[in-house]
Amino acid sequence: MARGGFPGGGFGGNMNNLMKQAQKMQKDMEKAQQDLENKTIEVSVGGGAINIVATGKKEIKEITIKPEVVDPDDVEMLQDLILSAVNEALRKADELANSEMSKITGGLGGLPGMF
C-alpha cells in the first residue's frame, strides 16, 4: 500500500509543498507581528482635547491632555474622554493587526483574536 494508505502516496507529493507554505506563512506572520510593534496609531477625541499614540501591538506610547480639559469640578468628563481615546486606539490597533495578518493568510478565516 502507498504511504498514508492512499494510492499514489496520499497527496501526490503536495504535502511537502503544503509544509513549505505553512512554514513560510509562519515566518511571515512572525515578521508582521514584529512590524506591528513599529507601526503607530494616533487617536484624537474631544476635538483634540485628548490624543493617544499606540503601537500596532496595543501598547500605549503617549497620552496628551490639553490643560483646558482638566477641570477639578468635572473629573468624570476627563475620565470618559481618556477611556474613549484608549478604547479607540485599541480598536484601531486590532484593525491594523487583522489587516496585516489577512495579507499573509489571504483572508483565511478561523484565526480571530490571534494577535
UniProtKB/Swiss-Prot annotation:
Q: Does the keyword Ribosomal protein apply?
A: no
Keyword line: Cytoplasm, DNA-binding
For this chain, one GO molecular function annotation is: DNA binding
Q: Does this UniProt record's set of keywords contain DNA-binding?
A: yes
Q: Please state where this protein is localized.
A: Cytoplasm, Nucleoid
An example Gene Ontology CC term for this record: bacterial nucleoid
Checking Pfam families in the record gives: YbaB_DNA_bd
Protein role: Binds to DNA and alters its conformation. May be involved in regulation of gene expression, nucleoid organization and DNA protection.
Question: Subunit info?
Answer: Homodimer.
Identify its protein family: Belongs to the YbaB/EbfC family.
Q: Which PANTHER family match?
A: NUCLEOID-ASSOCIATED PROTEIN YBAB (PTHR33449:SF1)
**What is the protein name given in its UniProt record?**
Nucleoid-associated protein Ccel_0243
